[in-house]
């Protein structure tokens, strides 16, 4: 995940852009930080999904097949 300083900088640039236009350098920095944030978020979300098992009230595994396949592929990588 991104450091707190990077998250603060993302918010600082977002707030500044609402008040005044960003410079070209600031716009490039904002884009780079947002890309890094999205990569970290997606990676974290994927890790969470790879550990999920869905069961109904009766205890039957109802995890979608697509997710089961992705989990199996992930296990085989390691």
Curated annotation (Swiss-Prot):
Disulfide-bond pairs as recorded: none
Taxonomy, superkingdom: Bacteria
Organism: Exiguobacterium sibiricum (strain DSM 17290 / CCUG 55495 / CIP 109462 / JCM 13490 / 255-15)
SUPFAM superfamilies, per database record: YnzC-like
Family recorded in the similarity comment: Belongs to the UPF0291 family.
A Gene Ontology term for the protein's cellular component: cytoplasm
UniProt KW keywords: Cytoplasm
Residue ranges, annotated region (Disordered): 57-78
Pfam family, one: DUF896
Subcellular locations according to the entry: Cytoplasm
Name of the molecule in the record: UPF0291 protein Exig_1097
Coarse class of the protein's main subcellular location: cytoplasm
Biased composition (Basic and acidic residues): 63-78
Keyword Cell division: no
Listed InterPro entries: DUF896
